[in-house]
């Protein structure tokens, strides 16, 4: 798979996805929205990794949506009749586009393995949508985020508000949304939005990769269950979640994995765990397998 916006490597059961357009401040061009979900789907469907690290190159993690590129794709016509029909369709087409873009980030939340965001410089506009869909966030000392959409006269629509409002206090979200101000790394850490702040990119990547290795060493089935249940708990009552996790473990708990984890701890060695099964991508003769 050849990508225009990303480099992908897999080592030690860690998939490292790198935004690779530093000269353009890793802006989100149309290819970005196609490539990221395709990469995540491939990794998840084929169980190619136990954890994903998402990072970038250049001065910023991402400068967000490339509005110049998207503006040039608006359909138009010199024919008044055709233009009138296009205008009638425009709202429905815009809605469809927004839903497509939302799924680009929702795939990070929905994939079975944890996604760690390593953020240097700015996470601007759509960058906030991106990092809030990840499981954990880490940032360099010069890092910041900004809900930049308000500065160009629009409401953020690709995931910032439903996710950010669950991660930090609502009043802070509203201040960021209404003013477009920058939230610096230390403020983000103090509010729990980022897990840790590092002096520079190298120190951050070293630490994030170490955390990724720790995750990759655990039982993938248990990690999958933990991510699924934590996400479920965020959107449901305690009573619902307690019942759901009981049903989950009644059907998914594997004694062999527990025994292996205990033996590995006793013997002071890495556990020999099974990987996640591949996702079904089509129906066939092996429906039960």
Label the predicted regions.
Residues 176-180, 226-229, 245, 265:
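Short alpha-helical scaffolding segments that buttress acidic/His motifs in well-ordered protein cores
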Residues 138-143, 194-243, 251-256, 273-289:
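C-terminal long alpha-helix characteristic of the crotonase
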Residues 106-221, 259-260:
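Crotonase-fold acyl-CoA enzyme core
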Residues 21-22, 218, 255, 268:
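Short loop-to-helix capping motifs
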Residues 1-57, 285-289:
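Conserved CoA-thioester-binding segment of acyl-CoA-metabolizing enzymes
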């Amino acid at each position: 798979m050849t990508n225009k916006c990303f480099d992908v490597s897999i080592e030690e059961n860690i998939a490292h996805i790198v935004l690779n357009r530093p000269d353009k401040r890793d802006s989100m061009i149309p290819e970005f929205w196609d490539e990221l979900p395709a990469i995540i789907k491939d990794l998840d469907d084929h169980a190619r990794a136990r954890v994903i690290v998402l990072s970038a190159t250049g001065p910023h993690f991402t400068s967000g949506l490339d509005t110049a590129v998207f503006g040039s794709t608006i359909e138009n016509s010199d024919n008044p009749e055709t233009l009138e029909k296009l205008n009638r369709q425009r709202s429905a087409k815009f809605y469809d586009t927004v839903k497509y873009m939302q799924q680009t980030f929702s795939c990070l939340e929905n994939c079975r393995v944890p996604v760690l965001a390593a953020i240097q410089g700015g996470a601007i506009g759509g960058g906030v949508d991106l990092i809030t869909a990840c499981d954990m966030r880490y940032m360099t000392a010069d890092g910041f985020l900004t809900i930049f959409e308000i500065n160009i006269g629009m409401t953020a629509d690709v995931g910032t508000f439903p996710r950010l409002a669950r991660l930090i206090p609502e009043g802070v979200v509203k201040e960021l949304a209404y003013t477009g101000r920058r939230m610096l790394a230390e403020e983000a850490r103090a509010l729990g939005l980022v897990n840790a702040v590092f002096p520079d990119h190298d120190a951050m990547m070293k630490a994030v990769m170490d955390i990724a290795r720790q995750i990759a060493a655990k039982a993938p089935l248990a990690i999958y269950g933990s991510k699924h249940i934590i996400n479920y708990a965020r959107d449901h009552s305690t009573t619902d979640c307690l019942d759901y996790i009981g049903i989950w473990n009644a059907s998914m708990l594997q004694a062999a994995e527990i025994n292996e984890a205990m033996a590995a701890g006793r013997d002071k060695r890495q556990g020999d765990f099974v990987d996640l099964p591949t996702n079904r991508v089509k129906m066939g003769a092996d429906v039960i397998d």
